[in-house]
């Protein structure tokens, strides 16, 4: 499937037209937040709950995409295993921003250090499901 087709499927499955808050979770989003804040080291407390406005994020994404992975790897907030893949993540985030802009009024991401595994665990705990 093309990326465009996958985005269309996402919108049909979960309409976002009424969304006011968009949360970016873990991975690329937390790295982008650290970069946007100019952190000298990765700081989960500074990242969790931070806001990335689309206008500023677009500038950061273009800068990041233009850097070769060996230069990205020199930045202490970019995990060594992410330096070569963060460019692809940046392209994906740009696509997500475009999707959001076309379908709702939100113009920023709020960043969460928590990821899908945290959500699954919280859901199971709420259900009282033993594992």
Residue ranges and their predicted role:
Residues 4-8, 12-131:
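Helical "lid/coupling" subdomains associated with nucleotide-phosphate turnover
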């Amino acid at each position: 499937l093309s990326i465009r087709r996958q985005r269309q499927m996402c919108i049909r499955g979960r309409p976002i037209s009424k969304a006011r808050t968009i949360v970016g979770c873990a991975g690329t989003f937390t790295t982008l937040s650290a970069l946007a804040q100019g952190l000298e080291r990765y700081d989960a407390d500074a990242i969790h709950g931070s806001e990335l406005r689309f206008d500023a994020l677009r500038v950061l994404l273009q800068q990041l995409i233009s850097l070769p992975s060996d230069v990205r790897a020199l930045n202490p907030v970019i995990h060594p295993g992410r330096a070569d893949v963060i460019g692809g993540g940046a392209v994906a985030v740009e696509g997500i921003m475009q999707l959001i802009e076309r379908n709702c009024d939100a113009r920023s991401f709020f960043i969460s250090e928590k990821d899908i595994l945290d959500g699954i665990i919280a859901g199971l705990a709420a259900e009282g499901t033993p594992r």
